[in-house]
Curated annotation (Swiss-Prot):
The gene is lptD. The lineage of its organism: Bacteria, Pseudomonadati, Pseudomonadota, Betaproteobacteria, Burkholderiales. Residues 1-27 are annotated as: Disordered. Together with LptE, is involved in the assembly of lipopolysaccharide (LPS) at the surface of the outer membrane. This is LPS-assembly protein LptD. It comes from the Bacteria.
């Protein structure tokens, strides 16, 4: 704002003389009038520029008076091109000045320009230099960041200058500190000398000290990148220096991503010895980043892990890799590569896309030797079947076409060898599903060609090229009270083998089969009231009949087919097998009934109970190799229940019951109690007769609840206040073997500005071996983490359903939340 347009009453009698300070008790008459006018304009909220609206001289063009414009929102960030046009507001107990030269404000002085506010006992502002000098109780609020001190010199628009004996507090993370001097470089950068930095909030006790604090020779603050860089710094915890850094290190000022070293991890492993890893994060672009993690293992050598991620409007993915030269454990180089890619492009004649999921490792023992790797690279690699799966697809309206290649790497164990699945080199699939057909009919056609390849010495059967086609037509009859859907399917399959079948001596086989099904159901509704609550109760009986004639398929090898799991999702289907190598001969009727309790306000399901059973009218002769034909007329009974009576409680159960033996074959019972944030208990019982019987319990719960301390609700991802202990864990116990299979148990302590975690993890890796780790971490909130072993947060998230991190990333607060 230009102060040259002060109104005439504020002009001194002799313009060449500076304005003199006078006693406020006896101001001259012209100053009384001027201050009265100035006070009136200040009360009305007008900038000093408005004081210049005097009559224009002869020939001059009158400038329009400034006016306020309505806006639907406050601007979080002021545009750069608008800053030079921003007016300056000043007020205080005593204001004097010279036009085009300066202004002086004494007593409760305040200067405002855009998102910058300066308070002081005395403030001098020089117009030509845009320079503000302030003394006594000086306070700057710059976009929510607050600086306080004794002496300030600042170029207001450029925001460059210095502040002596200063303290500061940042809006984004609540961090604050003290400094001998603050040099403001520009609006986003500052250099703080002999500085401290912490996020521990002060209390009223005179003996209070921050739990952790950084002391540094200097700290460079970059609010644009939200990064702090400390030179000659040391991290103190509970008054003890724990991490001196003679050089420089960076730390975040918010949750924004930044390039730099991530917290290191130190661990001890019985196989690898002492393990030290130091991740480096590279923020390449807003939609691309990379993490490189060198790792030193005292018993094995040095390895490097890397991860690259990318995100575009039409595609995304990640590339991971590990490399360890001359691993002393196996006396060879070890490596792993992984790629995941997903993408779809609009071509104008449909969308074309590519999906890739590929993983490869150097040797069969990789899954065993690197099963606990979590810092970069291939994470949690414990599976022994690794895919290299790529699918190129196209789709438009009712039609789709895809080309897929799938090749497996099987990691064999000499003590437990497995038969690898078949590669698909390639698989071509075409599908057509018209959105509407005349007469209310529905229909679809699909065709598939797959070349199955594998090592015949391991599979014991020939490879094959399989061509498959299926057409289906249905006519749904729908009404509010029920539905009837007849459906007719035609299956045609042709096999070409690379060698003669042992059973027939032929190199080809074919199969053509029809399938008919009739699905029907009714829906009855009534108002009901249970336990003081109103519900809409439904009763939904369902009958499903299917018929497929018998065709001998015993000579056809199995390439991609398996028996479906027996549950409520598969009991109402035409074929009991997934894949296309077996189509079961069926003449059966499935009967079931479900009742639901629905909330009449929002339609939410409070409870669900169901039962279903199959009635077989003839034996099922088509089976998988090693299976016996099915001759029982009545199948096992499926009984299921799900209860979500409130948002806090949940219960789900499915039981497969054999009425002939009066015993359950398989049971799954689960319950959840989640009364509020950071309080959850999950329990499950799983039973499969003759195979396994396990109890699984997982939890996260504040221990302070035991003595009546319920904590505070600080919002999502903010914890429940300081001084709180949390118990976390998961126990998987085998009743059949009478031992714990998997164990994760630990504690978390939240002290507001730091969080401590200690977790014991024991995971079964085979029948006879298990991996045990002790994980320890201190998180300095808003600064960094120090870990011993792998990151316990990832372990807790992977093992405890509904586990909540005590400090989730949250959007930065608005600058108007700290507005003066």
């Amino acid at each position: 704002m230009d102060l040259s347009s002060l109104p005439d009453p504020l002009r001194p009698t002799h313009s060449r003389l500076p304005a003199r300070r006078r006693d406020r008790a006896e101001p001259p008459r012209f100053e009384q009038r001027a201050l009265a006018r100035l006070a009136a304009w200040m009360v009305c909220g007008l900038p000093l520029a408005a004081l210049a609206q005097t009559d224009p001289g002869p020939g001059a063009t009158a400038e329009p008076a400034p006016a306020l414009r309505s806006s639907p929102l406050l601007q979080e960030k002021i545009p750069e091109d608008a800053r030079p046009k921003l007016p300056i507001f000043v007020r205080g107990d005593h204001v004097s000045g010279q036009p085009d030269i300066n202004a002086t404000v004494e007593g409760n002085a305040e200067l405002r320009r855009g998102d910058t506010i300066i308070h002081a006992d005395r403030l001098d502002y020089a117009v030509p230099d845009d320079l503000a000098k302030a003394r006594g109780n000086v306070r700057i609020n710059r976009a929510g960041n607050v600086y306080e001190g004794s002496v300030l010199e600042l170029q207001v628009d450029a925001f460059s200058g210095f502040f002596d004996d200063a303290s500061y507090r940042f809006l984004a993370n609540g961090a604050y500190g003290d400094a001998r001097r603050v040099d403001f470089i520009d609006r986003d950068r500052a250099l703080v000398h002999e500085a401290t930095y912490t996020t521990c909030q002060k209390n009223d006790e005179s003996t209070w000290k921050p739990a952790w604090i950084v002391r540094a020779r200097s700290i460079k603050i970059d609010n644009a990148e939200q990064v702090g860089t400390a030179e000659g710094g040391v991290l103190e915890f509970q008054g003890v220096p724990i991490l001196p850094v003679p050089g420089s290190f960076t730390f975040p000022l918010s949750d924004k991503r930044k390039t730099g070293l991530l917290p290191p991890t130190v661990g001890i492993d019985s196989v690898s010895g002492v393990v030290y890893s130091q991740p480096y994060y590279w923020n390449i672009a807003p939609n691309r980043d990379a993490t490189i993690t060198p790792m030193v293992m005292s018993k094995r050598g040095v390895s490097t892990s890397g991860e690259f991620r990318y995100l575009e409007p039409t595609y995304s993915g990640e590339l991971r890799g590990d490399y360890m030269p001359s691993d002393r454990l196996r006396n060879r180089d070890r490596w792993a590569l992984g790629l995941k890619h997903r993408g779809v492009f609009d071509t104008g004649i449909g969308g074309i896309g590519l999906n890739v999921d590929a993983t490869r490792v150097s040797d069969d023992n990789y899954w065993r030797d690197f099963s606990t790797r979590t810092n970069g690279g291939i994470s949690q690699l414990t599976q022994r079947l690794l895919p290299a799966d790529a699918t190129l697809f196209w789709g438009a309206n009712d039609m789709s076409l895809s080309l897929r290649t799938l090749k497996w790497q099987t990691l064999q164990d000499v003590n437990a060898r497995i038969v690898p699945p078949y590669d698909r080199m390639p698989q071509i699939h075409w599908g057509y599903m018209p959105s509407s057909l005349p007469g209310g009919f529905d229909g679809s056609v699909e065709a598939d060609y797959t070349d199955f390849r594998a090592d015949r010495a391991l599979t014991g059967q020939p490879n094959a090229r399989r061509s498959y086609a299926m057409a289906q037509f249905s006519r749904p009859f729908l009404a509010p009270a029920g539905f009837i859907t007849p459906r007719l399917q035609f299956h045609a399959t042709q096999y070409d083998f690379d060698s003669a079948l042992p059973s027939t001596g032929r190199r080809t086989a074919s199969r053509v089969l029809p399938t008919f099904s009739l699905d029907s159901g009714l829906v009855f509704e009534r108002d009901a009231r249970y336990f003081g609550r109103n519900f809409l109760q439904t009763l939904e009986p369902r009958a499903f009949y299917t018929y497929t004639p018998f065709r001998d398929q015993s000579m056809i090898p199995v390439y991609d087919t398996a028996a479906n799991d027996f549950n409520f999702a598969t009991i109402y289907t035409e074929n009991g097998y997934s894949g296309s190598d077996r189509i079961a001969d069926n003449n059966l009727l499935t009967l079931g009934v479900t009742t639901r309790l629905l909330d009449p306000e929002d339609g939410g399901e409070a409870a669900r109970f169901g039962i279903a059973q199959r009635l077989r009218f003839s034996d099922q002769k088509v089976v998988m190799p090693g299976e016996a034909p099915v001759s029982e007329r009545l199948s096992d009974v499926l009984v299921g229940a799900g209860i979500n009576w409130t948002r806090q409680w949940g219960f789900d159960s499915t039981v497969q019951y054999n009425p002939k033996t009066s015993r359950s074959i398989r049971s799954t019972i689960g319950a959840r109690y989640n009364p509020s944030d950071y309080r959850v208990i999950n329990a499950a019982y799983r039973f499969q007769r003759g195979t396994s019987e396990q109890i699984d319990v997982g939890w996260q719960w504040p221990i302070n609840d035991l003595w009546g301390d319920k904590g505070q609700n600080l919002g999502p991802g903010r914890g429940q206040g300081g001084g709180r202990w949390y118990s976390v864990g998961r126990l998987n116990y085998s009743l059949q073997d009478r031992k714990l299979v998997d164990t994760v148990i630990g504690f978390e302590y939240d002290s507001c500005c730091w969080i401590g975690r200690v977790v014991l993890e024991r995971l079964q890796s085979s029948v006879t071996t298990a991996t045990t780790r002790l994980l320890f971490q201190i998180e300095f909130v808003g600064f960094s983490r120090l870990s011993l072993g792998s990151d316990p947060i990832q372990t807790l998230k992977q093992n405890i359903p509904r586990y909540q991190y005590l400090r989730e990333p949250v959007p930065p607060p608005s600058r108007f939340t700290n507005y003066d």
